[in-house]
Amino acid sequence: MDRVVIIGSGAAGLSAAIRLAEENVPSFIVEEMPPWRAQSNMAEGGINAALDTMGQHDEPALHEEETYKAGRFLACREAVHRLTHSAPQIVNTLFAWGMSLNLNEDGTIQQRPFGGQTKKRTAFASASTGKQLMYTLSLIH
């Protein structure tokens, strides 16, 4: 059977392999270094998603507008829309898979402010979000 070749074992590569596996499509990852050495491990800030866990009435449409504006209106509008509207589901899926994230007292995902945003929209794992993301994706893959 043919296999899809994925170049790179960072977050994008592992995510692609997981998505293909969900569709029963075999894949093969070509990597220069193991996943724990990928650049994705270096990410510290967090993952932006309009989860509205901080009581600020956040929503994907506002996230979309702020992302498009932060990109000086040069980004592909459709890509920004897809990214911002799928972000809550992606973060919730990662959390359901066991990704360690900082939590509020009520057990919801804690979010903090980050550049270019008017709402607390960044889900994070202290200063090791990238490491937690890669660990989770490696377990699922």
Where are these regions (language model features)?
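N-terminal Rossmann-like FAD-binding beta1-loop-alpha1 element of flavoenzymes
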Residues: 4-28
